[in-house]
Structures are given as structure tokens and as C-alpha cells.
Amino acid sequence: MRVFVFGSSLTSSYWNGAATYYRGIYKNLAELGFRITFAEPDAYGRQQHRDNEDFSYANVLIYDSPRDIPFLLKQACESDLVIKHSGVGVDDALLEEAVLDCQSARTQVAFWDVDAPATLASVEADPLNSFRALIPEYDFVFTYGGGPPVVEHYLRLGARACHPIYNALDPATHYPVDADPQFACDLAFVGNRLPDREHRVEEFFLAAADATPEFNFLLGGEGWGGKPLPSNVRWIGHVRTGDHNRINCSARMVLNINRESMASVGFSPPTRVFEAAGAGACLITDYWAGIEEFFTPGCEILVARDAREITDLLKTVDAKLARELGESMRRRALQEHTYSLRALQVREILHQSSPGVLNARHRDLYRQLA
């Protein structure tokens, strides 16, 4: 099956939290025989911060938007499946509508949402939102997470079906390595500074650092320059994918903090959770509904509802216990949460549905109702 993808970036994780997800999904689909073309815009400095990885499993097209979009759409229409990811970052509204023109007796079109809470909030905030009327026209809607709340929401908006394809582990890229003294710390957090994350980073990570000056904290990610930090917090800037393992294996514990929108919806384990699991790191996460669907709290993952609970864990979980928890989490991830399993799930969904164009009568009726 030939698959043409529009996404933010496969080649760069710079200001692009979906990079690990894209790589895991498309590399493993390629291993199942899918032929992947991934089109990403030259935007946000990502091409100046490309990761040093092997992307030979996909034909990567770097384009200028909107100039190159008509040419790309012509190529896309020759594929068996066209995927438009949310959050491409440039001309999203144009692409969301334009890809639907590729639908034919041979070509199906999917919308793959990598930030469903933000997408759905945008739709609900504006009754005239252009994407709302397009949802029923896609052959498939996939989401990066969100579980039952997101599935039900998309179905209410007219989606034919909604399939969560959760983040996972790629054991070929995220695995245990020797500790690196330059990243040694008691607690590490890696995440870009974003509007609906910053307050939670202050509430969980920075407040815990303030309360425990005897411990060392490591902060990675873009945007934190100029942010007042406690003296025991060291900021290291953008963390390339190749450094994930060294950080995760050098910290006594690693912290995951979901963005506010993701935490409120639940069922959205981010890439950082599985990156840490692959390295066998001891992970503390903020609480969100659905955690137990992925890992067992207290046995495979630690859960903290506020900074006080984080400081309690820092004081009570020694290096030996941290290693044991990390090893348990890694075993569970390898058994149930790999990208090879997610790719099989996608293939099964695609094979259950035969190609076809949305019935014109159905389309016209929905547009009248919308």
C-alpha cells in the first residue's frame, strides 16, 4: 500500500513533540510493506535542527508552503492512502480540505490527530470552524490518544469511526545505556515551554525543586531561557532524540508532565512515557485518567498529584528501587506497547475497510445539516 503523509516533521524533533511518534508508526508500517512518503514543510527552523537518524524507511519531501502544495497533492492522489496529520503548522486548513479531493475508488483519505484535545476545543469554540464540516468526509479518523472521551466526541461530530493509536516504544531507538555524568541528577524533566504546560511545570517540577534544595534537577527542552529557575535546576536546552537514552539512564528518576489539555481528557500517554520506559527509567507522572490501562501505578510507574508527592518520592525511592520500577515498566512496554504492535493495529483497521468515495448524497445531506 502506498501512503502519502502530510505532517509537521519526521526528520526533526525541534519544537516537534510528535517526531518520535511519527518515526515509530511509519518505520513499522514500512516494515509491514507499506511504502511511505512523508511531506513536511520547511518551517520553524526544523531543517536547521535535523536529527541524525536513518529515515530511509520513508521518502521524505521537504516543501515550501503554500507554493509546493499543488504539486504534492498531485502525487498524493496517486497513492492508496493520504494522511493529513493535525498540527502541520503551516496551511493546515488548506490541507485539511484539499486532501479530500484525492478521494477516489482507489484512494482513501485519513485525518490523524496528534493533539485531539486542542483540535476538538477549537472546533467547539467556533460553530463556523471550517474543519467541523470536513470530519464526516474522511474515510478514517485516527488519534494519538484520548481514549473513550475523544472517540465519543469525534463520533458526535460525524466521524465514520475514530481509532486511537497510542504512543508506544521503539526498542531500536530507546533502550538502556550507560549513565552519563553530565546528565546525572535526581529528577529530570524534558519538555518544551508551551502555554498549557508552563503552569503545570511550575506546579510540579519547579515547586518540587524549590522544596528540596538538597536534590539536583535537570530541565531539557526549548523556550525556558529567561525563565527564573531554582538554583538546583540546570537547563540544557533542546534535547535531540539521540540524547534521550543518556538522560533517561542518568537520572535517578524522570518526570512526565502532561499538558493541561491532555491531562484533562486523559488516556493520552505522551511519547516521553515510552521513551523513559524503553530506557528502563523510573518514571513519575502527573495523574490523568487511564494511566492504569498502560502501566500499573506503584509497580511499573509512579503517580504524583502535586509537588509534595513528588518530593516524598524523591526522599523515599532510592536508586535500587528506582531501577526495579524502571525494569518492570520496560518489560510491560516491550510486551504490550511497541510501535510494531501499533502498526499491526493500523494495518488491521485499513484492511477492514475497502476503498470508496463518500456517497455524494450523504455528503450533501451532512452539509445541509451542518
Q: Where would I find each of the regions flagged by the language model?
A:
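Nucleotide-sugar donor-binding catalytic core of glycosyltransferases
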Residues: 2-5, 9, 21, 34-40, ...
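Catalytic binding pocket for nucleotide-activated donors in carbohydrate/polymer assembly enzymes
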Residues: 7-12, 21-24, 37-62, 156, ...
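Short amphipathic alpha-helix
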Residues: 18-29, 203-204, 346
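Conserved nucleotide-cofactor-binding alpha/beta core module
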Residues: 47-50, 67, 126-127, 131
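An amphipathic, basic-hydrophobic alpha-helix
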Residues: 62-81, 89-91
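Short, acidic/turn-prone active-site loops that include or flank metal/cofactor-
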Residues: 65-67, 115-116, 167-170, 307-308
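Short acidic active-site motifs
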Residues: 68-72, 130, 242-243, 309
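Active-site proximal beta-strand in glycosyltransferases
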Residues: 100-119, 140
